[in-house]
């Protein structure tokens, strides 16, 4: 996995109602983060997540217009502030956008944007330590299973830690951890390349995160811009392969950017990196819950690129399962592990 100081996304524009609800809880959590963290920062400024409420703008093709309108209607029925803009309204709202090949776009006009991931991580870490959590900088190399429980965890240094409940939150390495107990889940690392660039011509106004028909996205990052896409060779990668392909920007991303936003005719890449999505190859949705046979082994895996924005709701759900044995607030039963074993996808279409 990779961490970056660049703000990460928060968006309720999903095709599945439960994912919309998860993101709505995330928005509420992010907005109240400073207040929630205040007890753990006595006499100090609480961490600011710098939420940029600019929204996401999904470009919509003529053949995709009906489905896009239906998604917007569903999202709005749940209280989201998504709006569908036809071609003319889209051009009026974002005059710098090339709309000639678009039917329109769906835009989150409120409570949608991106935030500082490291601020979230550091706040969680500070609060957890204050509550008695011990962080161990080590690697898990083995799990001891007796009867129907994981009893201990072996670390690379040879230490052994006894286990009450094991939560597999290993991101792209989730399958490696599952395999230590003889289990298997369809979660593998998929490479994603990110590029930060400068443009000679600025984009005026409050620019959203634009998701092009090609799958390329771009959003402002201060005076710069962050972009990425889904590579053509989007297959499982080696767990330690973080080599970046710079030609992905030259050959695919830049042409897509220039077509959609003509102001991007002269760009200069300032920074780039490669990270891994923990990609659930069954249905692009997370796996949350206990294994039915190894009863203290819990999954929190496979979020396929939207894990950070779903982490507040999923973390709450994991704690509810551990404390109460059932979901108490948002019912995440559709994410249960049993669908994996039965090969029954719970599909999410809005994955970039």
Which residue ranges define each predicted feature?
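Helical element adjacent to the flavin cofactor pocket in flavoenzyme catalytic cores
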Residues: 101, 106-165
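A short coil-to-beta-strand element that immediately follows conserved catalytic motifs
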Residues: 51-53, 135-137, 186-192, 262-274, ...
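Short beta-strand to alpha-helix junction loop
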Residues: 21-24, 58-67, 107-126, 241-249
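Active-site lid/adjacent beta-loop-alpha segment flanking the redox-cofactor pocket in flavoenzymes
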Residues: 199-296
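Central helical "cap/lid" subdomain
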Residues: 157-206
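Mid-domain beta-loop-alpha active-site segment that forms a flexible
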Residues: 105-127, 171-173, 249-256, 303, ...
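Dinucleotide-binding Rossmann-like beta1-alpha1 core, especially the glycine-rich loop
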Residues: 2-93, 215-217, 257
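C-terminal catalytic lobe of FAD-dependent flavoproteins
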Residues: 117, 255-352
């Amino acid at each position: 996995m990779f961490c970056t100081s660049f703000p990460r996304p928060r968006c309720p524009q999903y095709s599945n109602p439960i994912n919309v609800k998860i993101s709505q809880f995330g928005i509420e959590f992010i907005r109240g983060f400073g207040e929630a963290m205040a007890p753990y920062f006595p006499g100090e400024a609480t961490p600011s997540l710098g939420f940029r409420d600019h929204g996401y703008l999904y470009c919509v093709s003529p053949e995709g217009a009906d489905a896009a309108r239906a998604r917007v209607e569903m999202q709005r029925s749940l209280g989201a502030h998504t709006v569908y803009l036809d071609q003319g309204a889209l051009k009026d709202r974002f005059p710098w956008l090339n709309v000639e090949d678009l039917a329109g776009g769906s835009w989150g006009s409120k409570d949608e944007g991106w935030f500082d991931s490291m601020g979230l991580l550091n706040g969680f870490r500070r609060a957890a330590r204050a509550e008695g959590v011990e962080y161990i900088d080590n690697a898990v190399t083995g799990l001891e299973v007796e009867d129907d429980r994981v009893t201990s965890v072996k670390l690379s240094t040879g230490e052994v830690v006894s286990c009450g409940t094991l939560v597999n939150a290993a991101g792209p390495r989730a399958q490696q951890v599952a395999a230590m107990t003889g289990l298997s889940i369809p979660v593998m690392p998929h490479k994603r390349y990110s590029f930060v660039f400068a443009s000679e011509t600025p984009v005026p106004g409050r620019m959203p995160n634009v998701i092009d028909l090609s799958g390329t996205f771009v959003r402002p990052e201060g005076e710069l811009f962050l972009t990425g896409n889904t590579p053509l060779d989007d297959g499982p990668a080696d767990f330690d392969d973080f080599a970046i392909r710079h030609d992905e920007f030259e050959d695919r991303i830049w042409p897509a950017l220039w077509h959609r936003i003509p102001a991007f005719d002269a760009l200069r890449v300032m920074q780039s990196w490669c990270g891994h999505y923990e990609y659930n190859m069954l249905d692009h949705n997370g796996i949350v819950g206990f294994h039915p046979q190894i009863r203290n082994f819990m999954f929190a895996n496979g979020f396929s690129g939207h894990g950070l924005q779903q982490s507040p709701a999923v973390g709450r759900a994991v704690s509810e399962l551990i404390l109460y044995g059932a979901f108490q607030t948002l019912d995440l039963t559709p994410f249960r592990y049993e669908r994996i074993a039965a090969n029954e996808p719970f599909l999410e279409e809005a994955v970039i």
